[in-house]
């Protein structure tokens, strides 16, 4: 971990489309957090507000977990401050979220009031064209990711048939101490983005990191996933 900061993606662009695990922002084994759900369209300052809150928290000695947007890794989807049991979260599409019990577990902040409506109106036609182009580019990108994902899954399946799964499972059980039983926390450390593949593996506080490249590494990780499925583990 660097400077009290950890980074994740709560959702990722994958060969099966966009997959979100926003429920993993707060670990299931943690005490309840109070969540400020930020509303309003693009350009109203949701990410900017979260960045400023994160900077202030770090400056005051708090650990901060940053959750970046897979559509723009420089933009924030959420910020968590564990010691304060506090979350700031973008609750707009495509991951629309609202407090389950407003006033008890969270509240909504409407940043739409800060939208420069006249500026948007002046560029109305341009913005509609750009939105259509963006949608077309995403459709093409996900088609490519889907094709790559199919090839990857086929390769991993073939590797699993030739691997000694019993030996792998024995190695995992003997070599790693499992956390206590519970519900795992699922998030992403890498994702394809419009800026390329973003990788946050170095922004963690793991004592030891083991890299398992290639399709055989994927087989190994699949078995590890099965082993920790019902434990308090970050996956």
Each model region followed by its residue ranges:
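Glycine-rich phosphate-binding P-loop
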Residues: 36-54, 195, 206-235
């Amino acid at each position: 971990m660097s400077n009290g900061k950890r980074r994740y993606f709560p959702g990722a662009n994958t060969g099966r489309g966009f997959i979100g695990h926003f429920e993993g922002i707060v670990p299931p084994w943690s005490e309840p957090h109070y969540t400020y759900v930020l509303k309003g369209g693009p350009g109203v300052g949701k990410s900017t507000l979260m960045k400023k809150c994160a900077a202030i928290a770090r400056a005051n000695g708090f650990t901060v977990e940053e959750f970046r947007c897979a559509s723009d890794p420089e933009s924030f989807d959420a910020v968590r401050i564990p010691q304060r049991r506090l979350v700031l979260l973008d609750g707009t599409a495509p991951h629309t979220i609202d407090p389950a019990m407003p006033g008890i577990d969270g509240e909504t902040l409407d940043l739409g009031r800060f939208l420069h409506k006249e500026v948007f109106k002046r560029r109305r036609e341009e913005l509609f064209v750009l939105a259509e182009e963006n949608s077309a580019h995403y459709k093409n990108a996900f088609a490519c990711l889907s094709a790559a994902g199919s090839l990857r899954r086929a390769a991993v399946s073939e590797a699993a048939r030739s691997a000694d799964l019993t030996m792998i499972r024995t190695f995992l059980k003997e070599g790693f101490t499992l956390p206590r039983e519970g519900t795992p926390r699922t998030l992403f450390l890498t994702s394809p983005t419009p800026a390329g593949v973003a990788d946050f593996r170095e922004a963690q506080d793991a004592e030891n990191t083991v890299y398992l490249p290639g399709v055989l590494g994927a087989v190994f990780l699949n078995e590890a996933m099965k082993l920790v499925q019902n434990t308090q583990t970050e996956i």
